[in-house]
Amino acid sequence: MANTRSSSQLVDAALELIIEAGVDRLTLSQVAERAGVSRATAYREFGDKDGVLAAVAQQEIGAMIVATMAGFDPQADLTTQVTLVVTNALRYLRGHRAFVRVRDHEPHWLLYAGLPIGNARMNVVQTVAAMVAAAIPSPDPLALPPLAAAEVVVRTVLSHALIEDSALTDQEVAQAVSRAISKPAIS
């Protein structure tokens, strides 16, 4: 995605339209109109609906990672780190209007959306897990390789964000994730 004023306007407009009416009915023409740019500009910037959706996903996943890592202490123990990441991610997703709209009405977009990463397409779990794995300060306390541990975190968060009814509190979810990815304590 080009980082131009019009591309930013188009991404913001697409996000607004997703909040209002969802992804299925979204068109690039609507996005262009909402952004106040020509259809030609929209097509030049993104090519098609998938292009603008990938740009929205890239922007919003980046924002989620920033929000999730707020207050992260690389010197803290793994349980503290995982608890912070899991609870921040759940809070962020539950408060994200576009995520909630799509979760409630078009969850297939969350489960099967592909994001272009280099020459490959990765699903949301793969994309976020790769970002989380890169942020893991040390693999030493992990019972799994960093990417696998990150995938456990992402899949658990996504599961609890998609299906909110749970007997577990967010804190308990975070503690369960921490136990799942941590090496057992040596006594």
At which residue positions do the language-model features occur?
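Short hydrophobic/aromatic patch on the recognition helix
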Residues: A35-F46
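Amphipathic C-terminal alpha-helical segment
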Residues: R91-G95, A134, E151-D170, I181-S187
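Amphipathic alpha-helical packing segments from all-alpha helical-bundle domains
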Residues: G62-I65, L110-P141, L147-E151
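Short amphipathic alpha-helix in the helical subdomain of ABC transporter nucleotide-binding domains
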Residues: N3-S7, P145-A150, V154, D170-V173
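Hydrophobic alpha-helical connector segments
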Residues: A55, M69-G95, A150-V153
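Basic, helix-initiating cap at the start of DNA-binding domains
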Residues: M1-R34, G51-A54, Q59-G62
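Solvent-exposed, amphipathic alpha-helical segments
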Residues: A13-E20, A63, A67-P74, T156-H160
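Amphipathic alpha-helical segments used for helix-helix packing
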Residues: L93-P116
